[in-house]
Amino acid sequence: IITDVEMEERVKLHRQSRPEYWRTYEAGTLLTPSIGEEENYLLDCITTYISNIMFEMTENMDYIGYEMQGKIENRVYSELASLIKEINEKDYNLNLVTNELGNSIVPSNHLARVFRDIQGRINQKIAALSDEVYLVACGIPVKIK
């Protein structure tokens, strides 16, 4: 979700950095309709996807109760698990990009804590479904699964 000029510029630069031969699908909050006949897919990124779902599902960003947090997390996981299942059924390849947010201090504001917690649990669940998992630190991929 593009919310300001800086984000619009960031997205534009990101699009320009992609090789011309890449076919790009910008899915927003609906992932599985993006699957076509290509054999290789890159979802970049789960963190942005979670943000999009949170903004779509939540009216009051000042406080997100535990029930709504669960609904957000369940929807994100359901969509990602469906995508992974469809990719596996077609014997395609899927690379997922996410951010590891749990290596820092606990955020001081409610929204950041909720987001970090949902992100962490989704990362764990997706890693469990994945054949391989890499943590990229300082541009160096480290295989952790």
For each predicted feature, which ranges?
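Short N-terminal secondary-structure initiator segments
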Residues: 1-9, 42, 133-137
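Conserved P-loop
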Residues: 1-36
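Conserved RecA-like P-loop NTPase ATPase core
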Residues: 14, 42, 99
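Ser/Thr-centric signal marking residues that sit
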Residues: 18, 24, 47-48, 98
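Short amphipathic alpha-helices and their capping/turn segments at secondary-structure boundaries
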Residues: 25-41, 79-91
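A basic- and aromatic-enriched beta-loop-alpha substructure that forms the phosphate/nucleotide-
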Residues: 29, 39-61
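Conserved protein kinase catalytic core
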Residues: 32, 50-51, 105-106
